[in-house]
């Protein structure tokens, strides 16, 4: 009996179907050749392994090659509790002055962090225009405000980075742990605008104010996450690269706040097709700059931070 051929991941099969459907509609609905090219390129990337495999494991069909430490791509999307804390300036807290806080978070965690969704663009009128444009890269503007974290590395390293990023980011989206916010909330401060935790309150606490060891839910906090990250790194043969696994082919959604990758130069603010006043970067959002971090492997160029 002949061996059954290995079945392609569902994600690849869906891509092939989308490609065939788009090809059929090309003459009927004027589907752009660029759309077909994008789908075709994604299929080739996954089948040939020319970049880290990015097959989403949404239905259990994806597997990690742990033995060979083949790179994987992890994506986590975290909602922001804007309904529970309408007066809390999450964007200002996460970005910091000139994007310095988000830049430091990325340097420390070796991940790609973006703020996406409704309310993620500085120019609200431009955001509304892009939301109604029907362009697929701005589809995220119809979703709730959220953070997207991407980690590309060997399996153990990728998960360790993701855990570290989630632990660090949680401190910035937990108003109860911000003494400035709690103090002002206790005095019944009204809604105001500013860069601090409370809209109109003092500025962000900065790195020195981000205390460690205040873990919640029984977890021992960032220190333990950092230890796990180091242990995962010591037990893998992976050679760290200055781009943290991202290459020049990386692209994503437009709008929001993100850091475009610029080859070996690291994460830099790139001029060009920005969306809205003061926006920079090829993906149409207000981009921050990616530079060297505290780890020996983080040797990217400094770039420049785009002001919020």
From Swiss-Prot:
Question: Which Pfam families has this protein been placed in?
Answer: KH-I_KHDC4-BBP
Concerning PTM, the database record says: The arginines in the Gly-rich domain might be methylated.
Q: Which CDD domains match?
A: KH-I_KHDRBS
Region Disordered, as annotated, extends over 203-222, 270-308
**Annotated Gly residues bias:** 203-220, 273-294
Which keywords are on file for this protein? Methylation, Ribonucleoprotein, RNA-binding
- Look up the domain of life of the source: Eukaryota
Classification via PROSITE patterns: KH_TYPE_1
Q: Which InterPro entries match?
A: BBP-like (IPR045071), KH_1_KHDC4/BBP-like (IPR055256), KH_dom (IPR004087), KH_dom_type_1_sf (IPR036612)
Ubl conjugation as UniProt keyword: no
GO biological process terms, alphabetically, are:
regulation of alternative mRNA splicing, via spliceosome
Gene Ontology molecular function, alphabetical: mRNA binding
Keyword RNA-binding attributed: yes
Where in the numbering of this chain does the KH domain appear?
83-118
Its Gene Ontology cellular component terms are:
nucleus; ribonucleoprotein complex
Q: What is this protein called?
A: Glycine-rich protein GRP33
Give the organism, scientific name: Artemia salina (Brine shrimp)
Q: What is the lineage of its organism?
A: Eukaryota, Metazoa, Ecdysozoa, Arthropoda, Crustacea
